[in-house]
Amino acid sequence: MDLLGHVGTREVIQDMDVMRAVLGDPKLSYLGYSYGTRLGSAYAEKFPQNVRALVLDGAVDSSQDPVQESLRQAAGFQGVFTAYATDCAKNADCPLGTDPAQAVARFRELVGPLEQTPAPTADPRGLSYNDAITGVQQALYSDELWEILTQGLSELRGGNGDTLLQLADMYDGRRQDGTYANTQDAFNAIRCVDDPRITDPAVTGRQDSEYRKAAPFLDDGKGTGAAPLELCAAWPVPNTSTPHRISAPGLPPTVVVSTTDDPATPYQAGVDLAAQLGADLITFRGNRHTAALVAGDRCLDDAVINYLVDLATPAPGLTC
């Protein structure tokens, strides 16, 4: 129980500053992705005088409450699903058909039956509905996985769930021996201690309805306007943060990278975080979650490296 109160962002940024001091660095140079952007922005707010260079890619906007963040992310995943379906439709054998306007309906026809009967797989577990959705979402994190997603949906159309189950296992951190990494559990523990809890069933009901509207490809059509309370509602320790705009007077020039079609941390979150920090915003055009030094884009990588090494700020309005 004591541990649960000390795994959140508040404690981690203190640890980061201790590590900086122990290593003998007068100031911190930091590149953070996804949740790492929350760590970076929180560190900047707490220790602006200790920052040398800060690059935040795939922004978590701390001014958003959990409901707002969830709905923004739902819309992000829907946008990337639409982009995938449009790309897939260029091929006559696309499992979602050649009309992107019908892609959601075709997708629901493929995954809906899994709610009653899992698809067979070489693994004795079979492919459940939840695993299918998880596998699809994993593939939407990067357009490098779209070809594999097409393979998985084509297999499902033929009654086989192997590839989608492999994608779900990738997301969940499942090892070959059947054990799992603790990544998802750790993420739940962190967000539950960081953020305010939603304890009103009416709020979760409205959130569920709005989520279905924002991401129709994830809507099973069974929404009633009611929904169970989420895991964090029963978390046994108080939350340590509330939504707020980041304020970091004295912070040196920093950089935020935001991808136009990022499903998990949508583009606008990066725009908003850059404004709060007074940071230079680099826009990356692509369909993926985070891009700096991982997408293989010379324009973006050069700008980030030049800043981290030489503190050379990117050109205003840089788009890569």
Write out the residue ranges for each language-model feature:
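Conserved acidic catalytic loop of the alpha/beta-hydrolase fold
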Residues: 2, 13-27
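Alpha/beta-hydrolase fold nucleophile elbow
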Residues: 25-35
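A catalytic-pocket lid/entrance helix-loop region that shapes and gates access to the active site
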Residues: 44-106, 151-176
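Alpha/beta-hydrolase fold active-site neighborhood
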Residues: 104-251, 294-296, 302
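Conserved alpha/beta-hydrolase "acid-adjacent" motif
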Residues: 263-268
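Catalytic active-site module of serine/aspartate enzymes centered on a nucleophile-bearing elbow/loop
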Residues: 285-320
